[in-house]
């Protein structure tokens, strides 16, 4: 699943450890973001290997307008004004006002809401958005304090803040990108399998509670806002997307971001920057790859071999 995220090296490893009798079923959307690392595995495979396109949207109701809206975008078309509705809202503002507007929208209805940004730095980046949202929404939450080598320390994360894990920890069943909420700071009743001291609890999006121990401290970050690469593969009831004139925001970025929403999309920025992002060719268009050529050559050899055997 989410095969558009598979890079060439990962796919090579998967193929290398299997036999010729193994069959792969790749499920993904080639219109979404290209893999972070090299290659365009799914993007090229669907142009060579027979594939099936699933065109019935399950994440959003057709009546919400979101499926039609995102179809326009993936075709490179700017949605017409009539396509904006109570489920798809553009909050037009200047770049300098984006952070304030995003924070106000989040505070008005934080439950089920995720802010998705293109970058960490900048006026619309997750760093400043997380800082501002914490100040406005949770300034009195208990700070996460701990002792290391006998010295007191603290993380700028407070009780009831949303958090995200940024590294895999297979021993604890945690994956990079797992979201949760920090709870019970200094009062955790949970213990790890090694009876380590728990500084707090983290309630995962699944409802499961896990103890926050020292070994996980460098693994968590604030998650009022997250980058799209962390959000890809996930879905949220409501998303807030700050939009600027940034080259990272291309057609596939906008399409991938907006399709994370289940019921409501709130775009913050100017219509001109939003339109430019839709018109900007996806980064995958500029990648130089060779997989398609190799696949076509292999298919041709296979076809010639079967023709020879038949004759």
What are these model-derived regions, one by one?
Residues 2-20, 226-229, 251, 255:
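Conserved RecA-like ASCE ATPase "motif II neighborhood" in helicase/translocase motors
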Residues 3, 21, 49, 160, ...:
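Short, well-ordered alpha-helix to beta-strand connector turns
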Residues 6, 172, 248:
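Short glycine-rich, flexible loops that bind phosphorylated cofactors or substrates
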């Amino acid at each position: 699943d989410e095969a558009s995220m598979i890079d060439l090296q990962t796919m090579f490893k998967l193929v290398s450890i299997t036999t010729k009798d193994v069959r792969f079923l790749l499920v993904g959307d080639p219109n979404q973001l290209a893999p972070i690392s090299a290659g365009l595995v799914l993007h090229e495979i669907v142009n060579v290997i027979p594939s099936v396109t699933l065109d019935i949207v399950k994440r959003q109701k057709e009546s919400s307008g979101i499926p039609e809206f995102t179809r326009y975008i993936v075709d490179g078309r700017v949605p017409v004004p009539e396509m904006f509705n109570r489920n798809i809202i553009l909050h037009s503002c200047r770049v300098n006002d984006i952070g304030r507007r995003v924070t106000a929208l989040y505070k008005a209805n934080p439950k089920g809401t995720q802010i998705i940004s293109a970058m960490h730095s900048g006026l619309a980046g997750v760093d400043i958005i997380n800082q501002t949202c914490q100040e406005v929404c949770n300034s009195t939450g208990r700070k996460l304090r701990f002792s290391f080598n006998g010295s007191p320390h603290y993380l700028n994360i407070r009780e009831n803040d949303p958090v995200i894990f940024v590294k895999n920890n297979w021993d604890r069943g945690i994956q990079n990108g797992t979201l949760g909420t920090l709870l019970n700071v200094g009062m955790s009743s949970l213990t790890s399998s090694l009876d380590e001291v728990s500084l707090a609890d983290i309630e995962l999006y699944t409802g499961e509670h896990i103890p926050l121990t020292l070994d996980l401290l460098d693994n968590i970050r604030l998650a009022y806002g997250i980058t799209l690469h962390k959000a890809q593969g996930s879905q949220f009831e409501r998303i807030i997307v700050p939009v600027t004139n940034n080259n990272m925001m291309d057609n596939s970025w906008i399409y991938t971001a907006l399709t994370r929403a289940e019921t409501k999309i709130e775009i913050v920025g100017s219509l001109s920057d939003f339109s430019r992002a839709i018109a900007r060719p996806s980064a995958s268009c500029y990648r130089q790859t060779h997989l398609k050529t190799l696949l076509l050559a292999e298919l041709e050899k296979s076809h010639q071999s079967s023709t020879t055997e038949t004759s």
